[in-house]
């Protein structure tokens, strides 16, 4: 399954997500602020990033932008946040997110979205290999 970086400042929500994703076989690394998330991304690759937006130090939008500038699109990003207006969603997607999920959410919906973005990423890699290979 996937190696996931979860950056979520609310400890209860982070624990809920971590437990749920581990039940589905994913490996989850948790950071509680954007600065800690950015530091770990310098040293370790992940299959997927799940980012809250409202966080101390570096918010999720800025972390997504930094990640895209440094690493491009090597891993998909899902924004997971309480901010749910159309304007918020547009900001998240414009920052480089591949998907956007608002709180409250169900674990099955999150897992389904993870599968979907990983399928799209896998399909793109296959297409790139076919075209380039």
Residue ranges and their predicted role:
Residues 3, 116-133:
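Short, Lys/Arg-enriched segments at the junction into DNA-binding effector domains
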Residues 8:
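Conserved acidic carboxylate
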Residues 14, 56, 85, 103:
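The feature encodes the CheY-like receiver
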Residues 15-23:
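Charged docking surfaces used in two-component/phosphorelay signaling
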Residues 25-32, 40:
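Short hydrophobic/Thr-rich beta-strand motif most characteristic of the beta2 strand and flanking loop
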Residues 33-36, 59-63:
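Acidic catalytic/metal-coordinating carboxylates
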Residues 49, 53-54, 83:
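The short loop immediately C-terminal to the conserved phospho-acceptor aspartate in CheY-like receiver
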């Amino acid at each position: 399954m996937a190696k996931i970086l979860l950056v979520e400042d609310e400890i209860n929500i982070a624990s809920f997500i971590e437990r749920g994703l581990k039940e589905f076989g994913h490996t989850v690394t948790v950071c509680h602020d954007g600065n800690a998330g950015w530091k770990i991304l310098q040293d370790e690759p992940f299959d997927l990033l799940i980012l809250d937006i409202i966080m101390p130090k570096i918010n999720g939008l800025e972390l997504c932008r930094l990640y895209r500038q440094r690493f491009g699109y090597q891993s998909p990003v899902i924004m997971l946040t309480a901010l749910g207006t159309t304007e918020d969603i547009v900001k998240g997607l414009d920052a480089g997110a591949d998907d956007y999920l608002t709180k409250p959410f169900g674990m099955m919906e999150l897992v389904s979205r993870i599968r979907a973005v990983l399928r799209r990423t896998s399909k793109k890699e296959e297409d790139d290999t076919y075209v380039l290979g």
